[in-house]
Amino acid sequence: LDKSIAADPHNAQAYAWRACSIGQGLGNGYLEGEMENPFEEIKTMIQKASELDENDFECNRLLCEINKFFEDFEQAEYYGNKACSLNPNDPRILSAMGDLFVITNRAEEGVNLLVKAYELDPMGLGASNADKRIGDVMFGTYVKGDYDLCLEYDKKIGKKHPLAWASLIASLESLGRSQEKSEELKKFKEANPEMLLEEIIEKVHFEDLGAKNKFKELVI
């Protein structure tokens, strides 16, 4: 991306993708200690991308994701709505907005968008199966409180990502199905011996900290 920017300093998407890449690296622990001030760098890239082309769909989609990472939910929704107005049926922005609504106390609306994204493009960009999209719906249905539907989507998934697994386990606990919860916890720990579900949930950018804490309690 540095080379892309050097080759074309007026390419707004290059700045947006660079900001997104740094954010993903921070979120996954890849960039610890490698950049002096990564958060300031992200903000600089966001500002530059927006200045260069405020009506680029891809830029607005990425700016939605980046602001969600920084928990600036108002800005995330602003850019997400702009992206939707430019390309209302792109499953990537439907997925981004669906996730945003789920973590900002609008889970019913969020689940509808996540299901629509799954139906439009089950695999998603760069994926080889539908597991990511289905897992996102499982998370949304758990937050919505539709625990039975979360379990129904679990029947469709191949390999669960950790947040989907946490959503399944929390749904089982919420339904009082303690034995099944214990079995799923055991499977998760065997598959991910160095991973803690509480740490996975901690990385979710819930607007309501109470919802995050309740989620953690249900997976213990």
What is each residue range found by the language model?
Residues 7, 17, 22, 52, ...:
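Short alpha-helical scaffold segments that flank and stabilize functional sites
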Residues 43, 47, 59, 63, ...:
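Alpha-helical protein-protein interaction modules
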Residues 56:
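Residue-level detector of flexible, active-site-proximal loop/helix-junction positions
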Residues 21-24, 63-67, 100-101:
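Hydrophobic face of amphipathic alpha-helices that form TPR/SEL1-like repeat modules
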Residues 3-30, 166-169:
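Short, charge-rich amphipathic alpha-helical segments embedded
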Residues 20, 30, 35-37, 65, ...:
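Generic preference for flexible, low-structure residues
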Residues 24-39, 70-74, 105-108:
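Short coil/turn connectors between adjacent alpha-helices in alpha-solenoid helical repeat scaffolds
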Residues 1-10, 37-53, 76-83:
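Amphipathic alpha-helices of TPR/Sel1-like and other helical repeat/solenoid scaffolds
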